[in-house]
Design a protein with these regions (language model features):
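N-terminal periplasmic accessory domains that precede
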Residues: 2, 13-14, 30-34, 46, ...
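Short acidic/polar hinge/loop motifs at secondary-structure boundaries
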Residues: 20-50, 54
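Transmembrane beta-barrel wall of Gram-negative outer-membrane proteins
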Residues: 99-125, 135-203, 229-231, 348-349, ...
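Flexible loop and strand-edge segments within Gram-negative outer membrane beta-barrel domains
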Residues: 169-175, 185, 189-246, 257-279, ...
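Surface-exposed extracellular loop regions of Gram-negative outer-membrane beta-barrel proteins
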Residues: 202, 257-261, 314-321, 365-376, ...
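Outer membrane beta-barrel strand-and-loop segments of large Gram-negative receptors
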Residues: 277, 281-287, 338-340, 435-441, ...
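Signature of Gram-negative outer-membrane beta-barrel scaffolds
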Residues: 297-401, 427, 497, 539-544
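Gram-negative outer-membrane beta-barrel transporters
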Residues: 350-351, 355, 363-364, 467-469, ...
Length: 655
């Protein structure tokens, strides 16, 4: 997700109170959020900007909190010495023709008045994605898949795909997700929850790399991610009505094991490269809450420890002979630790005013060791970081009469370089290689914002303004490796780049939103967001304008009209993105201008219809049409076009 112009490692992802960001979260585009099963999601909460000291490093753009469903206790009215048990759950089947999407889901809740077990399983299959057929006359071939590579008789062959250019060959994948939660509540003031989550995918092709060409031929025959694995086990204890100053204690202890891998082979080459990464992460969070008559105080401690393993080799697919290649990250013992103390205070003042203040002490240590330095001719054998920062926030809110709310505040954010920033060796495109830089420093942001909203029984309207100063920003720029500006990497002479603290930047923007009850059953809702960002100390060569900050999306919004009856609901809505002109792209960053048109990414607008019908209390049927006009469009910075017209049917049976 992109939040206020920041994404990837600059946005903090949380699931059930557990930090997902790990030591190898990269600054580019991430797919880690797909490892949280949306079939069992209860809600998503977004905190914009570094406005809460409850969250630490990485929350520059904000925090995305994902909450999965909780086990539900069964409170029986029957008086008996034996606790009554109850079983309920859901069966879901979903099909979408746009990429032959098939999803099967089941969740079961077994409970009495003290114990509850929730089990969820989802199997997902996605075929090759079909893009829209309706294109602009200015770009009649944009996104068309004219070819793909196949292996026939041990030879790479370019296959003609001109008969089905809208089918983005080799873009499908499969995924399974398992969740198990156990809740024990011996009394109303104590709750124990054991949380197990397992997510695993098939190989996932890097579609954009498979479309690259050089001198009229494909660059790659194979480029895919191996199975993306996220295993988590967590224990959460909540105790309330405590004696003493603090009334509530929340403790969360968790362990995660994560795996990523990348496999690639150039066209007509027999050498296939394998790179494997594994992260083991242990976390602890303890929070105490005091709730007074006119104030509230949270204090807490947090700690996360990451251990990273990175291996690599090349295998000749003809002879099956292995050879050494550079690992993606440091190949020796590598670890990263985060420690924090925080306090957040809320004071309820006279006249409907509320004052929020907070402080957080952050400490981050990183130790990386490079064992095999010969391949890349490393000028060092280790890289170490020890960073400490104090961040804070202050804000005022006014909760007035008739639903008026006004709030304004200032906050600071901090992100320490991680293993991905510090030790990575990779190429985002042919002839371009990023090398490690051990001299990195933390990034800092300073944020101000103003929020105004008005809510009544018939309408709501709101607006938010924000402005962020970005200091010590990490950017990828030209670099010298052993005093050379280009090196041989994967058999290609490549220009050398590295992550560096070279930039100061500003990010600013606004959001407006509103909804109105046109009738008791009909709601009109709309939202619009605009973001702008640029470096303040860098300019493109030969230009007087400021260099654009990467990751900044074009303006976007949504307008929808929804009508709800007792058993039936329907919504028609439009989603739109503005132009992202090529002069607004950062050509050295992560904006991926090579996958846009020569003018940039065109504006687009699609229309969708959602309907739902509930014939009985236990059965719900839904039907959707996405991208009704079958428009061909692509999200900014993406290397794959979005779905064309897509018919989706879903059946949910509750028992």
């Amino acid at each position: 997700p992109v939040v206020r112009g920041f994404e990837a490692s600059r946005v903090l992802l949380m699931v059930d109170g557990v930090r997902m960001n790990n030591a190898i979260f990269r600054a580019g585009h991430l797919q880690n959020i797909i490892t949280v099963d949306n079939m069992i999601l209860d809600r998503v909460e977004i905190i914009y900007g570094p406005s809460s000291t409850l969250y630490g490093s990485d929350a520059l753009g904000g925090v995305v909190n994902l909450f999965t469903k909780q086990p539900q206790l069964f409170k029986s009215n029957i008086t008996s010495k034996k606790a009554a048990w109850n079983v309920d759950g859901n069966l879901v089947y979903r099909y979408g023709n746009g990429q032959n999407e098939q999803r099967q889901h089941i969740d079961i809740n077994i409970a009495n008045n003290k114990w509850a077990y929730l089990t969820s399983f989802t199997n997902s299959s996605f075929g090759d994605l079909r893009q829209g057929n309706k294109r602009s006359s200015t770009y009649p071939d944009f996104g068309k898949r004219f070819f793909y590579v196949a292996r026939e008789n041990n030879i790479d062959v370019v296959k003609d795909n001109s008969a089905s250019v809208n089918i983005q060959k080799l873009s499908g994948y499969n995924q399974t997700d398992l969740l198990q939660k156990l809740m024990y509540q011996p009394n109303e003031n104590t709750t124990h929850i054991l949380n197990v989550q397992i997510s695993n995918s098939s190989n996932i092709n890097r579609y954009d790399r498979l479309t690259e060409t050089s001198k009229g031929l494909p660059v790659y025959s194979e480029w895919y991610y191996g199975p993306q694995v996220r295993n988590m086990i967590g224990y959460k204890l909540t105790k309330s009505q405590l004696n003493g100053y603090f009334q509530k204690l929340t403790t969360n202890v968790n362990y995660q094991h994560l795996e990523e891998s990348r496999m690639s082979r150039r066209f007509k080459s027999n050498d296939k490269e394998y790179r494997f990464e594994a992260v083991d992460m242990v976390g602890l969070n303890m929070d105490l809450l005091h709730q007074g008559k006119s104030s509230a105080l949270n204090i807490g401690v947090e700690s996360y420890y990451n251990n990273v393993g990175s291996t690599a080799y090349s295998n000749n697919i003809a002879t099956n002979v292995r050879s050494s290649i550079a690992t993606r990250y440091s190949d020796g013992p590598t670890n990263m630790a985060n420690y924090a103390l925080y306090a957040q205070h809320t004071q309820f003042l006279k006249g409907n005013w509320v004052l929020n203040t907070g402080l957080r002490l952050n400490s981050v240590q990183l130790n990386a060791n490079f064992k095999d330095t010969a391949l890349m001719h490393f000028p060092f054998t280790d890289a170490n970081q020890d960073n400490t920062a104090i961040t804070g926030n202050i804000g005022m809110a006014y909760n007035g009469a008739a639903g008026l709310r006004v709030s304004f505040g200032a906050s600071s954010g901090f992100r320490a370089p991680n293993v991905d920033d510090l030790t990575k060796v990779f190429d985002t495109r042919t002839g371009y290689v990023v090398v490690p830089n051990k001299d990195l420093k933390p990034e800092y942001t300073y944020n101000t914002e103003l929020n105004v909203s008005k809510t009544t029984s018939t309408y709501s309207i709101g607006a938010s303004l924000f402005y962020t100063w970005f200091k010590n920003a990490l950017v990828v720029d030209k670099f010298k490796w052993n005093n050379a500006s280009s090196i041989l990497y994967q058999g290609i002479m490549s220009d050398v780049y590295a992550t560096q603290n070279k930039a100061k930047a500003i990010v600013y923007g606004f959001n407006v939103n509103g909804s109105a009850n046109l009738t008791p059953n009909t709601i009109l809702a709309a939202t619009y967001t605009y973001t702008k960002g640029n470096y303040t100390n860098q300019k493109p060569i030969g230009l007087n304008t400021a260099l654009p900050l990467d990751h900044i999306p074009p303006s976007y919004g949504r307008i929808g009209l929804k009508h709800e009856l007792k058993k039936f609901s329907a919504e028609i809505f439009t989603v739109f993105n503005g132009w992202k002109r090529i002069e607004d792209y950062n050509l050295n960053g992560e904006d991926n201008e090579i996958y846009a048109t020569k003018e940039g990414m065109p504006a687009w607008q699609i229309w969708n219809i959602n309907t739902s019908y509930q014939p009985t209390k236990k059965l719900n049927l839904s039907f959707q049409i996405e991208n009704i006009a079958d428009l061909n469009y692509r999200y900014f910075a993406s290397g794959i076009s979005a779905l064309g017209r897509n018919y989706v049917v879903q059946a949910r049976y509750s028992f």
